[in-house]
């Protein structure tokens, strides 16, 4: 079975790298918006009291701008299909302390990926072509074999 796909891809993404925030704090916000529509996501992010809401809001807005530019799609048809947060690099500093000692400070960063999908461009628009194929010979070494363990004595034939 062969598929002829349209040139338009139904997904666009926005990637934010090296955002100075813990990945766990960003995941708390990302889990609330995953799978929701674009307009509903913007309302949720505007009212959320967390600091992670603003960078994620900017990424969702940027992904919607990418969708309207590349696919000429309407914002009402966009849904967040995938949203993930990965840990980024850790910035390590030293803070001077008493008696000439130093104290390490670790600033964590994260990478956030937002993928928007246009639900008006669905997979049902792809055309499937079933072409007749010549039957090919199967190799015996790679073919799957069925072993009947019950009639051949099974695993417990020796004691």
From Swiss-Prot:
UniProtKB keywords: Chloroplast, Plastid, Ribonucleoprotein, Ribosomal protein, RNA-binding, rRNA-binding
Superkingdom of origin organism: Eukaryota
Keyword hit for Ribosomal protein: yes
Gene Ontology molecular functions: rRNA binding; structural constituent of ribosome
One annotated Gene Ontology cellular component of this protein: chloroplast
One BP annotation, GO: translation
Location of the protein in the cell: Plastid, Chloroplast
InterPro entries: Ribosomal_uL22, Ribosomal_uL22_bac/chlpt-type, Ribosomal_uL22_bac/org-type, Ribosomal_uL22_CS, Ribosomal_uL22_sf
Signal peptide (UniProt feature, chain positions): none
Keyword Mitochondrion: no
Function: This protein binds specifically to 23S rRNA.
Oligomeric form and interacting partners: Part of the 50S ribosomal subunit.
Assigned protein family: Belongs to the universal ribosomal protein uL22 family.
Protein name, entry field: Large ribosomal subunit protein uL22c
Gene name of this polypeptide: rpl22
């Amino acid at each position: 079975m062969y598929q002829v796909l349209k040139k338009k891809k139904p997904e666009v993404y926005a990637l934010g790298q090296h955002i100075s925030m813990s990945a766990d704090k960003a995941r708390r916000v990302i889990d609330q918006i995953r799978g929701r529509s674009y307009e509903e996501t913007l309302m949720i992010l505007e009212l959320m009291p967390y600091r992670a809401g603003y960078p994620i809001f900017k990424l969702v807005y940027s992904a919607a701008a990418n969708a309207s530019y590349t696919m000429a799609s309407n914002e009402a048809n966009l849904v967040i299909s995938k949203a993930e947060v990965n840990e980024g690099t850790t910035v390590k500093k030293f803070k001077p302390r008493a008696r000439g000692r130093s104290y390490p400070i670790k600033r964590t960063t994260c990478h956030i990926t937002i993928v928007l999908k246009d639900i008006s461009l669905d997979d049902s628009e792809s055309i499937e072509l079933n072409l007749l194929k010549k039957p090919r010979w199967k190799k015996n070494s790679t073919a799957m074999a069925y072993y009947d363990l019950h009639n051949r004595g099974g695993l417990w034939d020796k004691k």
